[in-house]
Design a protein with these regions (language model features):
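N-terminal alpha-helical interaction modules that lie
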Residues: 1-72, 100-101
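Structural signature of alpha-solenoid helical repeat junctions
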Residues: 3-4, 8, 69-76, 90, ...
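Charged low-complexity stretches with an acidic bias
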Residues: 61-94
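Amphipathic alpha-helical binding modules
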Residues: 82-117
Length: 117
């Protein structure tokens, strides 16, 4: 049973990677409304997640963990959101919370640390 769960969790990371590649994320990208809409559509289709609802949640990290997102998947999602969504206070707070959450678990994300500064 544990092997099955680990495989399912790994699939989430793989799907996020495929979405990032499909949308051209991974390099330096200037966020645009079109890119935000594309990412939102992909996340809705693949994971039934709405970006705007996620950003408004009181504890989005708990929500993602409950949905089976691994630390790696949470990191990838935060990076994709940073690259696809125009910077707002809410997004910056979410990314800072992701960094703190991962740090507390002993998972260091150099990419997210470089974003937070």
């Amino acid at each position: 049973m544990e092997d099955f769960l680990m495989k399912e969790i790994d699939k989430i990371s793989e799907m996020l990677g495929l979405i990032a590649t499909k949308l051209g994320l991974g390099g330096l990208t200037i966020p645009s409304e079109e890119l935000t809409q594309q990412l939102n559509a992909e996340l809705a289709a693949s994971f039934d997640i709405d970006i705007h609802q996620l950003l408004e949640m009181s504890n989005p990290l708990e929500y993602l963990s409950e949905r089976g997102f691994s630390d790696n998947a949470i990191e990838l999602l935060a990076i994709m959101l940073y690259q696809a969504i125009p910077q707002t206070e809410v997004l910056n707070r979410l990314i800072k919370n992701v960094v703190d959450y991962l740090d507390n678990k002993g998972y260091i994300s150099f990419m997210l640390h470089s974003i937070v500064g």
